[in-house]
Swiss-Prot record:
Is involved in L-lactate degradation and allows cells to grow with lactate as the sole carbon source. PANTHER family: LACTATE UTILIZATION PROTEIN C. Belongs to the LutC/YkgG family. GO terms for biological process: lactate metabolic process. It comes from the Bacteria. InterPro entries: FTHF_cligase-like_sf, LUD_dom, LutC, NagB/RpiA_transferase-like. HAMAP family: LutC. This is Lactate utilization protein C.
Length: 231
């Protein structure tokens, strides 16, 4: 996956400033807010308490949450895949699968390969199960945050009929505030900044003008978060 290059940024911003009848700013000072409730929300909770908040939120977003350990992760994963009817499996090319001892070969999983180009999309389209890790997990909203990059295509969590997120317990944070802070810190190393950041809150949910819930129109029909104790 090639990183994009921004062209004509200066002239674009200069044109905006000109139409606003001002000089183009060379530096932006972030405002100091008097009140920052976002910094305090849920921050006093332990990791176990955050997990409980996440569990409760999953009930509202039609998502199953399963707890397991590194010793039992393969058995748990097999049970979830079987519950979803088995079928073709696609997963990220992510060293964390090996770190956690997850045996993807047991499910004959297709591993996303940048060199295979369009074949990745074709497999993702027909796959029944897509599996990724969660990089940051937001307890308040039940959201998994995925940092896409080489070997970590967006289609793995988008195109299959069902989706499984492996959630290391240590990745659970109170809310998006903490995720944004992490992203700001990552900006210091722009060479390794993710090519895409996706926030996924359970299966695909849509509603028409009559507010009738429709599941699976823009993504997976079902989703499971497997929370695993870190090594």
């Amino acid at each position: 996956m090639e990183r994009g290059t921004i062209h004509n940024k200066g002239s674009f911003l200069s044109n905006i400033s000109k139409n606003l009848q001002r000089e183009m700013p060379q530096h932006v000072e972030r405002p100091e807010w008097q009140y920052r409730p976002q910094d305090k929300t849920l921050t006093g909770l332990t990791q176990d308490e955050l997990l409980e908040v996440l569990r409760q939120q999953c009930n509202f977003i039609h998502t199953d949450l399963v707890e397991t350990t590194t010793d039992n992760i393969n058995e748990t994963l097999s049970q979830v895949i079987e519950k979803y009817g088995n079928g073709e499996v696609i997963a990220w090319n992510d060293k964390r699968f090996a770190d956690f001892g997850i045996d993807l070969e047991a499910h004959d999983a297709f591993i996303w390969d940048e060199a295979k180009g369009a074949e990745n999309l074709q497999v993702a389209e027909r796959a029944n199960v897509g599996i990724t890790f969660s990089d940051v997990t937001l307890a308040e909203s039940g959201t998994v945050v995925l940092y896409a990059d080489k070997g970590k295509g967006r289609s793995v969590s988008l195109l299959p009929a069902t989706y499984i997120a492996i959630v290391p317990k240590s990745t659970i944070v109170p809310r998006f505030t903490q995720a944004a802070q992490q992203m700001n810190a990552m900006m210091e190393d722009q060479e390794n900044f993710p090519t895409c950041i996706n926030l996924i809150t359970g299966p695909s949910n849509s509603a028409d003008i009559e507010m009738k819930l429709v599941v699976g129109v823009h993504g997976p029909i079902k989703a499971t978060y497997i929370v695993v104790d870190d090594k």
